[in-house]
A protein has these predicted regions:
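Cap/lid segment of the alpha/beta-hydrolase catalytic domain
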Residues: 105-222, 232-233, 280-281
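Proline/glycine-enriched tight loop/beta-turn segments at coil->beta junctions
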Residues: 82-85, 92-102, 108-111
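Short glycine-enriched nucleophile-adjacent loop
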Residues: 251-262
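N-terminal targeting or regulatory segments adjacent to alpha/beta-hydrolase or S9 domains
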Residues: 1-71, 79, 115, 150, ...
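Mobile cap/lid helix-loop segments that gate and shape the active-site cleft of serine hydrolases
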Residues: 199-214, 218-227, 266-306, 311, ...
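C-terminal catalytic histidine-bearing segment of alpha/beta-hydrolase fold enzymes
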Residues: 289, 335-379
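Short beta-strand/loop motif that positions the catalytic acidic residue
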Residues: 309, 316-318
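Alpha/beta-hydrolase fold nucleophile elbow
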Residues: 236-248
Length: 379
């Protein structure tokens, strides 16, 4: 027996995963792309078990600035649940006409105190922890700013449990926070203490949501779709040319949002591609509770969620030494998506690249990602 997350039960549990799953487009009975996608997407949305969709959010402009060649709006909107959502909308200064747009999806990174600030910059003096974060994962770049400067409208918002949407210490019982309080929230020691609490709190969030008939992905997909609603409504945005992109937890959100919403015309998922088998046997200990959708692995393999948007173009960027996944299962995910796109007659609209190095979305990878978005949203 190969050591795995379930020990002697691992092989038995793995045998419960059909390959291909029931609603995989790789199944021979599925020949009509449109009818398959309607069936599979409906089942995916059912498994997500998210909140009832609400109206397009009414965004209030908190303030506007011009920074480093960009016009930036600080926005806030209220969803039917939780604290207000903070967001940034970035676009080239003095831009004219309709522009392509991207929903920029921030990562997890074991840091729930921050959300949108992980991939944006609106001051020459950002928080020191965000400088460290961007240096570690993004070659020191705020990639949402970099993309906006290329001629995009980029919307970056805090999603469920991050940044402005985080669960506040004062709102949970003292027994689960060791009576910890937030006296000076922007202090580094308090941020690190909050993130330790938030990491330990994840299993309680997942349990509680299950008791409400909800899933964690169902909630963040709803958050992200409402942001998409707002972005598509902006007068400077061409709603037929909207994409999404993100690293890690942002890559997860890219996968899930792309699978759920046909308005996403181009996607770049970075550092978040593998198979359910990899999660099951090898790597669930390296991942957040945000990943899991009960029942879905019987219907679609993890990469096939992204494939629900075929023939819209998708780019997957992997790192060979990424400790969050095993390389064989990253490669198997590539084979699965390649098969889906070939069968749909859209092989040229799918690409996966494998880079050397650990978990990251560095400058070289950003260059490929931006070129892909340019090809399909500007071409």
């Amino acid at each position: 027996m190969t050591p795995n997350m379930l020990g002697a039960y691992g092989d038995w549990a793995n045998q419960n995963l059909p390959d291909p799953p029931r609603l995989s487009f790789r199944q021979p009975q599925f020949q009509n792309l449109d009818s398959w996608r309607a069936l599979a997407r409906a089942r995916y949305r059912e498994c997500l078990s998210g909140p009832a969709p609400s109206a397009k959010p009414i965004a209030l402009v908190q303030h506007q600035i011009e920074f480093d060649g960009l016009e930036i709006e600080h926005l806030q909107w209220q969803l039917p649940y939780g604290p207000p959502t903070e967001a940034l909308l970035l676009k080239p200064a003095k831009a004219r006409g309709k522009l392509p747009a991207v929903v920029g999806l921030h990562d997890h990174g074991g840091n729930k105190y921050f959300g949108l600030r992980k991939i944006t910059r609106i001051t020459k003096d950002p928080h020191p922890l965000m400088l460290q974060h961007q240096e570690r994962y993004y070659s020191g770049l705020a990639w949402a700013n970099e993309l906006a400067r290329r001629g995009y409208v980029v919307l970056v918002h805090d999603t469920f449990t991050f940044g402005s949407r985080r669960i506040r210490l004062a709102d949970v019982p003292g027994v689960i926070r060791n009576n910890q309080v937030e006296a000076n929230p922007e202090a580094e020691d308090e941020i690190k203490a909050y993130n330790a609490f938030a990491g330990a709190h994840e299993h309680l969030v997942a349990k509680s949501l299950t008791c409400a008939g909800l899933t964690w992905p169902g909630i963040f997909v709803n958050d992200d779709q409402r942001a998409l609603d707002y972005l598509a409504s902006r007068p400077e945005v061409d709603a037929t040319r909207i994409g999404c992109a993100g690293l890690s937890g942002g890559g997860l959100r890219t996968v899930m949002l792309t699978g759920a919403d046909e308005r996403i015309r181009c996607s770049v998922a970075v550092g978040m591609m593998t198979t359910w088998r990899d999660y099951l046997l090898n790597k669930c200990h390296t991942h957040t509770w945000m990943c899991y959708v009960p029942g879905l692995p019987l219907e679609l393999d993890y990469p096939e969620i992204l494939g629900l948007n075929v023939p819209n173009p998708i780019l997957v960027l992997n790192n060979r030494q990424d400790s969050l996944f095993t390389l064989p299962e990253m490669e198997r995910a590539d084979q699965i998506l390649s098969a889906v796109y070939r069968k749909a007659g859209a092989a040229d609209r799918y690409k996966a690249s494998f880079y050397e190095g650990p978990h990251k979305f560095d400058a070289e990878m950003q260059k490929e990602a931006f070129a892909w978005l340019d090809r399909w949203l500007k071409g």
